[in-house]
Amino acid sequence: MREVAAPPETVFAVLTDHRRYSELTPLRKSVLEREGEPAPNGVGAIRKLTAVGPALREEVIGYESPGRFSYTLLSGLPVRDHVGTVELTPNGSGTKMVYAVRTQPTVPVVGGLVVAVVKQAVKGLVDGVVKESERRTAAGG
């Protein structure tokens, strides 16, 4: 759980701007391969994210502005049933962000490593989203 000094609308806008992830997070490249509904970054959108190693392809499966966003991993890690969900709730003048990931490594021997990589990736993403959301709020936008 993270406290963000920005309203949920701002945090949601930053969180779901897939094309800008490489500017805000440790990702080297972020591409929107397919647009979704009701917005380009909405349900059905497919994003390709590259840090190190193989690119991750994820599909947006939940887009409820400004409170909830979720995705599933299509390829890039030896896992199955990988779903990430971010819930944003108003908290005073800011936002409480809860980011949860459910995943099942397919190769037990490297399962611990996969979980560690996922945790580090989520931390980098959350840190970038929080920083940009707070920057926008402080700048009045």
Where are these regions (language model features)?
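Glycine-rich portal/gate segments that line the openings of hydrophobic small-molecule binding cavities
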Residues: 3, 23, 32-77, 128-141
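Hydrophobic ligand-binding cavity/cleft-lining segments
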Residues: 1-35, 96
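Residue-level recognition of well-ordered beta-strand positions that form the cores
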Residues: 3, 48, 72, 87-89, ...
